[in-house]
């Protein structure tokens, strides 16, 4: 999609900014007619190079002639007239000063890009604001419902007190009336009738109050059920999905504190209802009648309250931090036998009456059917302390939690050797950790159980990349915690899903994810030239099948590049110096129109162990197609000896009998090499220790420096005019410095 086309899709306020860029000196109609051609030219170079600007000026006139011819074929007289007029204006204004025209076009294109970037930021901010507003409104609505539930139960509490007072008064008046009837003098029949009418009226009030309270409790339980369903089926499910994404590098998981507040309020409300029902039962025992609404409804309401409370408590027991080895904090859910790992469970309800001696017990593969149904499925024992008392010290907010910090896995060895006949390889075999505890309260015991996300168990650290690939694939596609047979028939992933997860792998360990161009190249690697968001990638294509004609698959290649970035290229990647994922064809298209010495950095597509290279462009002396030179890729072995910025600073090419020259001048598109990498160059070291302490003229060893030198035949360098000839003595000395391999290389030229 051309830049000009993107601009035309913007809102009117941004289009107005585009209108202000163009006037009669360079009319917008030329920008419209020659949009793609204009965007492909290097106007920045032409803006300071008269010769290059002159060529581009005449090229532009030729393009207008071609456009005029197309309009002639269409018999479009008006557009023909406009083209001729525009061409004359350009000739009048810039024939003698083509650099000025190049400067105008360069600035216009540059300002267009700024407008696009501003529009994109504006749209993202708008989308973010909308999403945040929707989320905030949703939270406010739920918070209001939870608070309303709390208010309702307080109102019922007051109603029960009123009922108790009314019942006490009724009981007192009944007894008083009975005592008076039993006295010797008795009471007048008229007074007795009046008292009975009053007592009957009080009874009706008492009966109505009981019915009213029962009705309000029933309605409150209806509200609680709806609110609780939202908490359990929406909010908690969303949190668990966010946790899955966070485990595989996605945005950090949201805090559980808000959920805990809601869960706790609802739980306290249900506990209060249980107490209120007990109070109603006490009032019933003191005074009952037919039909008593308390007698009729108490068991149903009590059972319903208990079921809601049980459901809430059982759902509130979660794995707050998934199993993870401290040695690999950014790759949870992959566990190595014999290596300690940690896991943390938490109860999202703060109940003061809870038994603080509640123990959590951890099990491995409890009730896992695959142990019996999948051939070759491995079995493991948990070593270390796998039980712990839940306490509030494990959490800063007073919630009950238990973190098991010193767990290890050991494989159960069966008699004989393990066969490899099973359908799953080790890193596709999924296991799970489950946690059990009990909530004990007077007259109430609730069994709680929760399960971790599936884990992969490896026995060698070399299996970690493959195990992590399984974790990525599962958590990208599945929300079920116990689908341990997933890899018996793994589903395909949409490219739109996988591309996001791939970008997370970089953004989670660096400050920069993958941009659209980098993802486009990776998409083509997996899906071919017609890669799109709806493209389907099989599991085998992702990490089992060799890519193209290479002897390695896609994921191991990505993983080794990630390691290379983390260990040797982190600052350069964070600064955006590394283009990284770009095909050779795209690389040449970008460099073709750049000034000589322009280079870019990309990752090697042919190195399984992860490597980076640079390619630079040279102008051909005969005016033909430019020449491109790519250096042999650098792996972690070379980068452990010399940093990549120092390699770029000191890199030399050498042709026979010429002084070596550094061909790298500008980081694409036009950033001075020293400006881009200067802050990462190694600083001069202090003078080393003297060779001979008794000789004051000796200041120390002669310092050496490792540099990268490429020896090439003079015919491969198109800029040999810039290389100064060396004398035989100079050439011999340089050969000695470079190394003994130089003579053997020269003898083959």
Swiss-Prot record:
Domain SH2: from-to ranges: 573-670
Sites of the Glycyl lysine isopeptide (Lys-Gly) (interchain with G-Cter in SUMO2) crosslink: 703
Coiled-coil intervals, chain numbering: 136-317
Induction: By IFN and EGF.
Keywords: Acetylation, Activator, ADP-ribosylation, Coiled coil, Cytoplasm, DNA-binding, Isopeptide bond, Methylation, Nucleus, Phosphoprotein, SH2 domain, Transcription, Transcription regulation, Ubl conjugation
CDD domains reported in the protein's UniProt record: SH2_STAT1, STAT1_CCD, STAT1_DBD
GO molecular function: DNA-binding transcription factor activity; DNA-binding transcription factor activity, RNA polymerase II-specific; protein homodimerization activity; RNA polymerase II core promoter sequence-specific DNA binding
Residue list for modification ADP-ribosyl glutamic acid: 657, 705
One GO CC annotation: axon
Entry-annotated residues carrying Phosphotyrosine: 701
Modified residues (N6-methyllysine): 114, 175, 296, 366, 525, 637, 665
Loss of function: phenotype: Resistance to bacterial lipopolysaccharide (LPS)-induced lethality.
Per UniProt, location of the Glycyl lysine isopeptide (Lys-Gly) (interchain with G-Cter in SUMO1) cross-link in this chain: 703
SMART domains listed in its UniProt record: STAT_int
Functional description taken from the UniProt entry: Signal transducer and transcription activator that mediates cellular responses to interferons (IFNs), cytokine KITLG/SCF and other cytokines and other growth factors. Following type I IFN (IFN-alpha and IFN-beta) binding to cell surface receptors, signaling via protein kinases leads to activation of Jak kinases (TYK2 and JAK1) and to tyrosine phosphorylation of STAT1 and STAT2. The phosphorylated STATs dimerize and associate with ISGF3G/IRF-9 to form a complex termed ISGF3 transcription factor, that enters the nucleus.
Self-association state and partner proteins as the record states: Homodimerizes upon IFN-gamma induced phosphorylation. Heterodimer with STAT2 upon IFN-alpha/beta induced phosphorylation. The heterodimer STAT1:STAT2 forms the interferon-stimulated gene factor 3 complex (ISGF3) with IRF9. Interacts (phosphorylated at Ser-727) with PIAS1; the interaction results in release of STAT1 from its target gene. Interacts with IFNAR1. Interacts with IFNAR2. Found in a complex with NMI and CREBBP/CBP. Interacts with NMI which is required for CREBBP/CBP recruitment to the complex. Interacts with PTK2/FAK1. Interacts with SRC. Interacts with ERBB4 (phosphorylated).
Protein name: Signal transducer and activator of transcription 1
Organism (species): Mus musculus
Lineage of the species this protein comes from: Eukaryota, Metazoa, Chordata, Craniata, Vertebrata
């Amino acid at each position: 999609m051309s830049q000009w086309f993107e601009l035309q899709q913007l809102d009117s306020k941004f289009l107005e900014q585009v209108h202000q860029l163009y006037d009669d000196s360079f009319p917008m109609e030329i920008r419209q007619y020659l949009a793609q051609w204009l965007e492909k030219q290097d106007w920045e170079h032409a803006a300071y190079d008269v010769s290059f600007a002159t060529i581009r000026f005449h090229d532009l006139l030729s393009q207008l002639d071609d456009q005029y011819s197309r309009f002639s074929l269409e018999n479009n007289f008006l557009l023909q007239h406009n083209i001729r007029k525009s061409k004359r204006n350009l000739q009048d204004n810039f024939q003698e000063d083509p650099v000025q025209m190049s400067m105008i076009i360069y600035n216009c294109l540059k300002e267009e890009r700024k407008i696009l970037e501003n529009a994109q930021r504006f749209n993202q901010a708008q989308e973010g604001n909308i999403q945040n507003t929707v989320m905030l409104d949703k939270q406010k609505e739920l918070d209001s419902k939870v608070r309303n539930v709390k208010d309702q139960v307080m109102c019922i509490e007051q109603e029960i007190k009123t009922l108790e007072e009314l019942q006490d008064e009724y009981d007192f008046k009944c007894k008083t009336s009975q005592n008076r009837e039993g006295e010797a003098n008795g009471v007048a029949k008229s007074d007795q009738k009046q008292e009975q009418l009053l007592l009957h009226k009080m009874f009706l009030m008492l009966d109505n109050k009981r019915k009213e309270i029962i009705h309000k409790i029933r309605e409150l339980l209806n509200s609680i059920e709806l609110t609780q369903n939202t908490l359990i089926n929406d909010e908690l499910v969303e949190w668990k999905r966010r946790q899955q994404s966070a485990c595989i590098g996605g945005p950090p998981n949201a805090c559980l504190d808000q959920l805990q507040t809601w869960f706790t309020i609802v739980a306290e409300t249900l506990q209060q209802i249980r107490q209120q029902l007990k109070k109603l039962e006490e009032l019933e025992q003191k005074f009952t009648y037919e039909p008593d609404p308390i007698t009729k409804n108490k068991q149903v309401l009590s059972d319903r309250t208990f079921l809601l409370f049980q459901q809430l408590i059982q759902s509130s027991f979660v794995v707050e931090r998934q199993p993870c080895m401290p040695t690999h904090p950014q790759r949870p859910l992959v566990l190595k036998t014999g290596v300690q790992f940690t896991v943390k469970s938490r109860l999202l309800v703060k109940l003061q009456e809870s038994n603080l001696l509640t123990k959590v017990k951890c099990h491995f593969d409890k009730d896992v059917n695959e142990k019996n149904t999948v051939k070759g499925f491995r079995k493991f024992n948990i070593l270390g302390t796998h039980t712990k008392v839940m306490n509030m010290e494990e959490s800063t907010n007073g919630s009950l939690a238990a973190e098991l910090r010193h767990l290890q896995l050991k494989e159960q060895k069966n008699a004989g050797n393990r066969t490899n006949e099973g359908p799953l390889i080790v890193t596709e075999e999924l296991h799970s950790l489950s946690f059990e505890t009990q909530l004990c309260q007077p007259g109430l015991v609730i069994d709680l159980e929760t399960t971790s996300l599936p884990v992969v168990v490896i026995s060698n650290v070399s299996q970690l990349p493959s195990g992590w690939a399984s974790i990525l694939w599962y958590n990208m596609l599945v929300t079920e915690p116990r689908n341990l047979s997933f890899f018996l028939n793994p589903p395909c992933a949409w490219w739109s899903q996988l591309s996001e997860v791939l970008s997370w792998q970089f953004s989670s360990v660096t400050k920069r994810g993958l941009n659209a161009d980098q993802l486009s190249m990776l998409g083509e690697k997996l899906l071919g030239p017609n890669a799109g968001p709806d493209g389907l990638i099989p599991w085998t294509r992702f990490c089992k099948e060799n890519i193209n004609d290479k002897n390695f698959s896609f994921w191991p290649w990505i993983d080794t590049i990630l390691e290379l970035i983390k260990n040797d290229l982190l600052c350069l990647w964070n600064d955006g110096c590394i283009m990284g994922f770009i095909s050779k064809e795209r690389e040449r298209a970008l460099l073709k129109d750049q000034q000589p010495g322009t280079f870019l950095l990309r990752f090697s597509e042919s190195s399984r162990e992860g490597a980076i290279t640079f390619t630079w462009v040279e102008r051909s002396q005969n005016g033909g197609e430019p020449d491109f030179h790519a250096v042999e890729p650098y792996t972690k072995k070379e980068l452990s000896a010399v940093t990549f910025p120092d390699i770029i600073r000191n890199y030399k090419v050498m042709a026979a009998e010429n002084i070596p020259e550094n061909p790298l001048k500008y980081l694409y598109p036009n950033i001075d090499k020293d400006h881009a990498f200067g802050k990462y160059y190694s600083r001069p070291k202090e003078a080393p220790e003297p060779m001979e302490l008794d000789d004051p003229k000796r200041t120390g060893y002669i310092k050496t420096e490792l540099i990268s030198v490429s020896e090439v035949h003079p015919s491969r360098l198109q800029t040999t005019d810039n290389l100064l000839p060396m004398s035989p003595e100079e050439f011999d000395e340089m050969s000695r410095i470079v190394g003994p391999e130089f003579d053997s290389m020269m003898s083959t030229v």
